[in-house]
């Protein structure tokens, strides 16, 4: 008699910080014979990305309420109830053995639907402070996991699943051993770029002329404007692009990173073993600040919050990072990483089925 094939439904959507870790766990369990489906929304990145990975996806209609008007707020209970009913139909039709909530608005109705159908819920919080949806779902979840300490008081710290290509990078001492010349600084503001980085870094390049060489991801639609800023500062030799397809290659090239502090970015920088200057996005719960705090406490990174992110301040920090300092910081970053995060999450998913 053959063992029953186990079924996982991943609930994640909206941003790469939710979707890519979910894909990592999905592929890991699929390699062990699991069947995997996805619960998402039809108008966000998961709608196209997940099927490209050979995973079927079901959709519910749900969106966030932050920043919406009074009418949207008043209609919210109806829309949440409708999404919950849609998710329950999907759960009953496919009958997963366990669901994994990796974040995004879809996780709320999806998690409630699974719980109401008697399906165990495993919850993974990617950020250093838990959002409203996950704080609610934690109360009904079989297991709660967190990437960084402090999001939940008693949850296991398992890290964030990151791409295999990043985990495969050589150790910092091997990458940095023979490097000379200008310090290589990678500037990334996420796939959409970050205006504060685009406005500040061309002048930093001029202030530290000859000391730095930059690879700057500016985000969609900002290329012409940022190229003009570099030209106005007499710094046209730097590599300026809208989007970087191969982040592992970019991390391998870099000596240091200047970036936002999204959960997946922080985890990838630690896994790669790179010093970082973090500029957290100004969110009311300071989510990105708490993501970056662990690496700053490990003396592997520096945080400059956006109101203080000036040409002078950034230049002073980067000018103080010589090659021996960068190597020490890189080694501390990699020591703070959790490289087996994918396996840890997958084990907890499997354990929830057996419990």
Curated annotation (Swiss-Prot):
Its main location: membrane. One of its GO terms (biological process) is peptidoglycan biosynthetic process. Keywords: Cell cycle, Cell division, Cell inner membrane, Cell membrane, Cell shape, Cell wall biogenesis/degradation, Glycosyltransferase, Membrane, Peptidoglycan synthesis, Transferase. It is found in: Cell inner membrane. It catalyses: di-trans,octa-cis-undecaprenyl diphospho-N-acetyl-alpha-D-muramoyl-L-alanyl-D-glutamyl-meso-2,6-diaminopimeloyl-D-alanyl-D-alanine + UDP-N-acetyl-alpha-D-glucosamine = di-trans,octa-cis-undecaprenyl diphospho-[N-acetyl-alpha-D-glucosaminyl-(1->4)]-N-acetyl-alpha-D-muramoyl-L-alanyl-D-glutamyl-meso-2,6-diaminopimeloyl-D-alanyl-D-alanine + UDP + H(+). GO terms for molecular function: UDP-N-acetyl-D-glucosamine:N-acetylmuramoyl-L-alanyl-D-glutamyl-meso-2,6-diaminopimelyl-D-alanyl-D-alanine-diphosphoundecaprenol 4-beta-N-acetylglucosaminlytransferase activity; undecaprenyldiphospho-muramoylpentapeptide beta-N-acetylglucosaminyltransferase activity. Pathway: Cell wall biogenesis; peptidoglycan biosynthesis. GO terms for cellular component: plasma membrane. It is a peripheral membrane protein. UDP-N-acetyl-alpha-D-glucosamine binds at residues 15-17, 127, 163, 191, 244, 263-268, 288. Belongs to the glycosyltransferase 28 family. MurG subfamily. Cell wall formation. Catalyzes the transfer of a GlcNAc subunit on undecaprenyl-pyrophosphoryl-MurNAc-pentapeptide (lipid intermediate I) to form undecaprenyl-pyrophosphoryl-MurNAc-(pentapeptide)GlcNAc (lipid intermediate II). This is UDP-N-acetylglucosamine--N-acetylmuramyl-(pentapeptide) pyrophosphoryl-undecaprenol N-acetylglucosamine transferase. The gene is murG.
């Amino acid at each position: 008699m053959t063992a029953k094939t186990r079924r996982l439904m991943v609930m994640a959507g909206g941003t790469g910080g939710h979707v890519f870790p979910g894909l990592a766990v999905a592929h890991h369990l699929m390699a062990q014979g699991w069947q995997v489906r996805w619960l998402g929304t039809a108008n966000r990145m998961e709608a196209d990305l997940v099927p490209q990975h050979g995973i079927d996806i079901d959709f519910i209609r749900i969106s966030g309420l932050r920043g919406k008007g009074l009418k949207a707020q008043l209609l919210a209970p109806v829309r949440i109830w409708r999404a919950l009913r849609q998710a329950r139909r999907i759960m009953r039709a496919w009958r997963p053995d366990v669901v994994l909530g990796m974040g995004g608005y879809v996780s709320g109705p999806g998690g409630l639907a699974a719980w109401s159908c008697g399906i165990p819920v495993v919850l993974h919080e990617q950020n250093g402070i838990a959002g409203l949806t996950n704080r609610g779902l934690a109360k009904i979840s079989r297991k709660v996991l967190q990437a960084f300490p402090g999001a939940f008081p008693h949850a296991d710290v398992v890290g964030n699943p990151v791409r295999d290509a990043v985990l495969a990078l050589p150790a910092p001492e091997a990458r940095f051993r023979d490097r000379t010349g200008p310090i290589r600084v990678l500037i990334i503001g996420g796939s959409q770029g970050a205006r504060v980085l685009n406005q500040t870094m061309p002048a930093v390049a001029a202030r530290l002329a000859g000391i730095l060489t930059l690879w700057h991801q500016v985000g969609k639609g900002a290329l012409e404007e940022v190229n003009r800023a570099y030209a106005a500062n007499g710094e046209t030799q730097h590599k300026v692009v809208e989007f970087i397809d191969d982040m592992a290659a970019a991390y391998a090239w870099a000596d240091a990173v200047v970036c936002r502090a999204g959960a997946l970015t922080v985890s990838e920088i630690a896994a790669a073993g790179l010093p970082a200057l973090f500029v957290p996005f100004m969110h009311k719960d300071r989510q990105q600040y708490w993501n970056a705090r662990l690496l700053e406490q490990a003396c592997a990174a520096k945080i400059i919050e956006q109101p203080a992110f000036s040409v002078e301040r950034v230049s002073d920090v980067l000018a103080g990072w010589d090659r021996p300092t960068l190597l020490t910081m890189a080694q501390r970053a990699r020591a703070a990483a959790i490289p087996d995060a994918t396996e840890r999450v997958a084990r907890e998913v499997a354990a929830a089925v057996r419990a």
